[in-house]
Regions:
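A conserved FAD-binding loop/helix module that cradles the flavin
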Residues: 55, 461-483
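Rossmann-like flavin
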Residues: 93-199
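Short beta-strand to alpha-helix junction loop
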Residues: 158-167, 210-230, 382-389
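A glycine-rich dinucleotide-binding beta-alpha-beta segment and adjacent secondary-structure elements
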Residues: 177-191, 348-350, 403-465
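Helical element adjacent to the flavin cofactor pocket in flavoenzyme catalytic cores
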Residues: 204-256
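Mid-domain catalytic core of redox enzymes
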Residues: 246-363
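FAD-dependent oxidoreductase catalytic-site/capping-region signature
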Residues: 348-435
Length: 488
């Protein structure tokens, strides 16, 4: 008889795990508290405009290929990928921007034109980054984080000094241009920590950027979610929407015995949570929780975000599909996220206009705009603050790109700390999970298997391997393999 597994949540890691577990012959049910699937990667449609509510960057295409290949499929069986050209654009001041080409040779030329001799240093840096990528993404990140010995290989031992240096030091060894430094330090922001707190080994993110390029699934990132749901359904996974898990039930021997869902008890013998780890533990009696409130409070979390989804009644100029605005003090903004949590004085921000390359995103002649300001998790969140910062960044956007856009806003929707808590039960309203610092890597992250409750597992951005969409796909695989290994 097939054994039942219930998965809480339907984000990337939960969907990934559901596919692997169904393939192994388990009877899998996914319980989603919201009315649509996808977790943070849901979709928002209004007046002919389409927005991804969450993740908007498609990096590490090989990880997606590897996921679908495990089921005899390809990404192209479910969605169409376009390589973006340019990959993205970075603004450093008024009418001062650099476009990151999809072609590595062009990137070398751009570096050399900005700083003589920098192309040679970039090549050396990317050689190291590629080697680290092959070690990390093709091997280490697929480890379950049970033992420190998982990190010990001949290749990692040879690079041990990189774990005790940091990205900021490595980037600045040979590159002096402030513009180029900002470009090279940008990719590790996806890992949720400051470059000065991110081990130098993580320079593999620069290879993911320059070496593998930036892609876009036609129709948006939600196409990936729909592809995974289609795959899961074909494997026999059941989905239940508006299914709010209120408690995880256990027997006297501390085995999972059931779930309280919308006030009703359902029997199950194994639970895998793709929901927020901290929130999941609050669904247990206090003596069955592995980590105290003090533990969580001491951890370094990735930022929260203030997001705006904006419909414009005209096409936007002087920007790209992905555009970063690094014209203000990065160190001050980082300090106001990690060290002295407060609303940023003069924030960096990110803008995304999918309709520049994908005509499914907006009606003809109009533009779908997505704006993001990284924030400290847990800070005050009011409508007044949201409105203030909307005008702050649109004023800057107009000045830097030399155009008027405010008058062209048809509608806007915001999403911030309160919404991350309400919609995703996110700890302190964080957006990306727990940061990948040296002391929050691999076996030092919250465990994928509960040490106090039998047959309770976790997957997602607070456990291994960490924040981001590709790591979420991998996390689902790791959790499913551990469940199988433990002979459930």
């Amino acid at each position: 008889m097939k054994k039942d597994i219930h998965i809480i949540g339907s984000g990337f890691s939960a969907l990934s795990a559901s596919c692997y577990l169904a393939k192994e012959g388990y009877n899998v049910t996914v319980l989603e508290k919201n009315d649509t699937l996808g977790g943070r990667a849901r979709q928002y449609k209004k007046d002919g405009f389409t927005f991804d509510l969450g993740p908007s960057w498609y990096w590490m295409p090989d990880v997606f290929e590897r996921f679908f290949a495990d089921f005899g499929k390809k990404p192209s069986d479910y969605y169409v990928l376009d390589k973006l050209s340019p990959g993205y654009e970075v603004y450093f001041g008024e009418n001062s921007s650099l476009k990151i080409s999809e072609n590595l040779e062009d990137i070398y030329k751009m570096f050399e034109s900005e700083e003589k001799g920098s192309a040679k240093h970039l090549k050396s840096f990317l050689d190291s980054a590629k080697a680290n990528y092959e070690i990390a993404v093709l091997d280490i990140v697929y480890k379950p984080g049970i033992s420190p010995l998982e990190l010990v290989t001949t290749k990692t031992v040879a690079r041990v000094t990189q774990f005790f240096s940091n990205i900021r030091k490595e980037v600045r060894k040979n590159i002096k241009s402030s513009k180029l430094i900002k470009i090279l330090e940008f990719p590790v922001l996806f890992l949720g920590a400051k470059p000065s707190n991110t081990p130098a080994f993580y320079n593999f993110m620069n290879y993911a950027d320059f070496g593998l390029g930036t892609w876009h699934p036609r129709g948006g990132m939600y196409q990936v979610i729909e592809g995974m749901v289609s795959l899961a359904t074909s494997l026999g996974v059941n989905f239940e929407l508006n299914a709010n898990v209120e408690k995880i039930l256990t027997d006297k021997k501390r085995n999972v015995s059931g779930l309280l869902v919308n006030g009703k008890t359902i029997e199950t013998t194994l639970v895998l949570s793709g929901a927020d780890y901290h929130h999941t533990e609050t669904l247990l009696d206090e003596d069955l929780r592995q980590y105290s409130e003090k533990y969580w409070d001491k951890k370094t979390f990735a930022p929260s975000s203030l997001l705006f989804y904006v419909g414009f009644d005209k096409k936007i100029e002087n920007a790209s599909h992905h555009t970063l605005f690094f014209d203000t003090d990065f160190d001050l903004h980082a300090e106001e996220i990690y060290d002295n949590p407060k609303w940023p004085t003069n924030p960096l921000f990110y803008a995304n206009f999918t309709s520049m390359t994908d005509n499914t995103s907006a009606p003809e002649g109009k533009e779908a705009g997505f704006f993001l300001i990284p924030l400290a998790p847990g800070i005050e969140d009011t409508e007044e603050l949201r409105e203030t910062y909307f005008h702050k960044i649109l004023d800057r956007f107009e000045q830097l790109t030399n155009q008027e856009v405010k008058k062209s806003v048809i509608f806007k929707r915001s999403f911030c700390v309160k919404d991350f808590k309400k919609e995703y039960n996110s700890y302190k309203g964080n957006a990306y999970g727990m940061a990948n610092t040296l002391l929050q890597t691999a076996f030092l992250r919250p465990s994928i298997k509960s040490s106090k409750v039998n047959n309770l597992y976790f997957t997602g951005q607070l456990t291994v391997p960490g924040p981001g969409v590709p790591p979420a796909l991998i996390s689902g695989k790791i959790a499913s393999e551990l469940i199988k290994k433990n002979k459930f």
